[in-house]
Amino acid sequence: MSIRRTHPGRPRLVPSNTAAPPREQVLHAAAQLFVTKGFAATSTREIADKVGIRQASLYYHFTGKDEILAELLERSVRPTVERVDQIEQLTASAGPETALYLLALVDIHTLAEAPDNIGMLATHPDVTSSEAFDAFRSIRAELADAYGRIATQAAAPGVATAAEPGHLGEMLMHLVEVTTTLRSSGAPIDDATAAVIASTCLRACGIPDSRITPAAASATTLVGELTMSAPT
């Protein structure tokens, strides 16, 4: 369980040029360093220096690097997990193909809007071997279960019987996670790109284009009914 500090920090070494709360500034600075330099290679002093605070002040907000990493990892998944129930409710009459397409769109949005492309962190060896990653596995498993459950309902019979729901869910998550790779290469994640990724998820389930096209149209309409906010 995360321990959140509520004490005010010490005076800044460098005045802040952002209106974001100090805790958010620490997360933003850490995300930039973890993604570009690596989690293991980044010190709390470097994070504090980037924010413009004393190293001791960082500990008013976090117990250390692992807690910072745990929160960043969660932010790359939690926004999608929190919308799974709403997705299934909205698509109850539209069918599982629409539900799967909509889930993929929401997940793509989460990864595309995540600050500093923090979705990439889950692919770094120094992150996957950290204690913080253990907690992340649990929430990530929730999302994989949702993908697997919905995909099994939508998939062609041969796919549904050949792949266990958990394995199918993991496969689809990996397809969607190409979003982070595209971001790191500088490619824009626009509506057209999101549609290609989401459609690929359905094709991987053996769903023909004759069913993907209406599912995409329905999901694109329904996405406007979701509370879509970028991870902070």
Stretch-by-stretch model annotation:
Residues 98-99, 110-134, 148, 181, ...:
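Amphipathic alpha-helical segments used for helix-helix packing
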Residues 1-7, 141-156, 181-232:
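C-terminal peripheral helix-coil segments that are non-catalytic and often amphipathic
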Residues 81-84, 121, 130-157, 166-173, ...:
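Amphipathic alpha-helical packing segments from all-alpha helical-bundle domains
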Residues 21-31, 47-48, 68, 72-84, ...:
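Generic hydrophobic, amphipathic alpha-helix propensity
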Residues 25, 33-71:
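Helix-turn-helix
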Residues 176:
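Cytochrome P450 catalytic-core helices
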Residues 8-13:
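Arg/Lys-rich, glycine/proline-spaced intrinsically disordered segments
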Residues 71, 85-113, 117, 172:
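Hydrophobic alpha-helical connector segments
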